[in-house]
Design a protein with these regions (language model features):
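Alpha-helical transmembrane segments of multi-pass membrane transport and lipid-handling proteins
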Residues: 93-122, 172-173, 180, 278, ...
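Hydrophobic alpha-helical transmembrane segments
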Residues: 128, 132, 161-209, 226-230, ...
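Interhelical loop/hinge segments that connect adjacent transmembrane helices in multipass membrane
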Residues: 1-13, 202-245, 285-302, 423-437, ...
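Helix-loop junctions and terminal segments of transmembrane helices
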Residues: 66-82, 153, 210-211, 267, ...
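Membrane-water interface segments that mark the loop-to-transmembrane alpha-helix transition
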Residues: 15-27, 53, 62-115, 129-130, ...
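Membrane-proximal transmembrane or re-entrant/amphipathic helices at the cytosolic face
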Residues: 2-5, 447-488
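Transmembrane helical elements of multi-pass membrane transporters/channels
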Residues: 16-32, 47, 167, 191-198, ...
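Membrane-interface junctions at transmembrane-helix termini in multi-pass inner-membrane proteins
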Residues: 139-163, 185, 349-381, 420
Length: 488
């Protein structure tokens, strides 16, 4: 098999999507157990409070991270592929030095801004001290992100999988007992313990491959300029993402209550996180390979289209199954107190189909280092997201939020694909459009039937649709892989 086939073949994409999808599935399964226990112990209000703290951590981490998580992977991946070992070690030392700088910056900024964050997040009580105590989490997150970028760029895929599994196991065994004993008072301490355990696990692996070295001199700043220039553009995109996340949760807390925040967070977790298991291989495997393609338009289009096909075919049966079983799955995953979010989740599942179309194409600008393009696309998405979120909530409560997510995905994909065609000569294959039409038809059928009937006939039709989606995906993927091996 030549290099082109290796990097863009269905077998390679399916292999690593399955590996990381399987690992992420295990991680999510353990996370489900943890979330179930936390939901029972804290309820929607406690889950809402935790969501606000987590969105604050993400916002400050993205603001002070300087986009190093993305620019470092791109830089190190190139050196690793070209086997420039000495330069690679030097760059790793540079990235670690800047991880320390961003960790300190995040710590200080969190402490300084805590009164302001408290003012805009809560209309009641004083949580300034709680926000200050998030500072160590932000510092540890920055240090962990630097080490993870090194492992991603140098293709330590198995180790990354192990880090994910051990991290979520530590979160389970440390946080649940604290919530059981102390209730909501344990939220911030448990978040600190989770961040610390994740950091220890990560450095245990990364230090094994590349011993820890840092330096702080004039070269630390001069050598990092190209990487920082690229990273700062990604920084803006990251701030918009975590900022919009923070805005919508704060908006829900002000306009509604912490219960609304908890319900929304549960719905978001089920759709965007649990159903996003298939996308876990994107950043770890797909992005480095796409970065190595360079300016070869034909190979890039082949790789992106195949990633689109595999992602859609793998995720569609899972989404249709989730849609059908939501009335049963939602109380099992959380509790009966979260059933009010069912209408939102059901319609928001269609946003995941949009997500499967969006991610592989969005990574083109990222892989090319077109920071301005990436920034503008991200800004467009989050402006659409906040607008549709506000309109949806004001007009149809939680169901409106779910519908807003779908409309956001649809409008953004139209913009994204038109731009990708104009800028990068990317064109989606007719075969991919056919697959999408079939899977969307089956999903629409299940949505309509499950929303309007609860008879034996309706359940039979839903089961038939799930089986049809699964068999169709299996047939296409099997034939695609067989065709590659026949051509060898």
């Amino acid at each position: 098999m030549n290099k082109k086939e290796t990097s863009s073949s269905y077998s390679h994409i399916l292999k690593y999507t399955s590996i990381f999808g399987g690992v992420q599935g295990l991680v999510i399964l353990i996370g489900m157990v943890r979330n179930k226990l936390i939901a029972l112990l804290l309820g929607p209000q406690g889950m809402g409070l935790m969501a606000l703290f987590n969105s604050t951590v993400r916002l400050i981490s993205d603001t002070t991270g300087l986009g190093l998580g993305v620019s470092a992977v791109r830089e190190l991946s190139r050196l690793y592929d070209e086997e420039h070992h000495e330069e690679l070690k030097s760059r790793i030392e540079l990235i670690r030095s800047w991880s320390v700088i961003t960790a300190c910056l995040g710590f200080v900024l969190c402490v300084v801004l805590s009164p302001l964050i408290n003012h805009y997040s809560f209309s009641w009580g004083n949580h300034t001290l709680h926000f200050m105590l998030l500072a160590p989490i932000i510092a540890l997150t920055a240090l962990s992100a630097g080490e993870l970028s090194i492992l991603k760029a140098t293709r330590k895929l198995r180790r990354l999988a192990e880090i994910s599994i051990y991290g979520v196991l530590c979160a389970l065994v440390t946080s649940v007992p604290l919530y059981y004993i102390f209730g909501e008072s344990a939220i911030v301490p448990s978040l600190i313990i989770i961040a610390l355990s994740q950091f220890i696990i990560t450095i245990t692996y990364s230090f094994h491959y590349y011993p820890y070295r840092v330096h702080f001199d004039s070269a630390t700043f001069s050598e990092a300029k190209p990487m920082l220039r690229l990273g700062i553009s990604f920084l803006g995109a990251g701030i918009m993402g975590s900022g919009s996340d923070f805005i919508v949760r704060s908006f829900l807390n002000y306009e509604g209550s912490l219960d609304d925040v908890g319900l929304y967070n549960a719905g978001y977790m089920i759709t965007m996180t649990y159903a996003g298991v298939i996308f876990s291989a994107m950043e770890t495997d797909y992005f480095p390979r796409l970065s190595s393609v360079g300016n070869n338009v034909e190979e890039r289009n082949l790789l992106v289209n195949r990633q689109l096909e595999v992602s859609l075919l793998l995720i569609s049966p899972l989404l249709i199954l989730l849609m059908s079983t939501l009335p049963i799955a939602l109380p099992l995953l959380y509790s009966d107190a979260f059933l009010d979010v069912l209408p939102m989740v059901k319609v928001a599942i269609f946003a995941m189909f949009m997500r499967s179309l969006e991610l592989p194409v969005s990574y083109i600008a990222l892989s090319r280092g077109d920071s301005k393009v990436f920034f503008l696309l991200e800004m467009t998405y989050y402006l659409l997201f906040i607008t549709m979120f506000w309109l949806g909530y004001k007009n149809a409560y939680l169901f409106g939020i779910g519908l807003g997510l779908v409309v956001t995905g649809l409008l953004f994909n139209l913009i994204l694909y038109a731009f990708a065609y104009q800028k990068y000569s990317f064109c989606i294959s007719k075969r991919m459009l056919l697959y999408l039409a079939i899977q969307l038809f089956l999903a629409g059928l299940v949505y309509f039937i499950s929303s309007n009937s609860n008879t034996l006939l309706s359940w039979s039709i839903q089961v038939a649709a799930i089986v049809a989606s699964s068999c169709f995906s299996f047939y296409i993927l099997r034939n695609s892989i067989s065709g590659i091996f026949k051509r060898k």
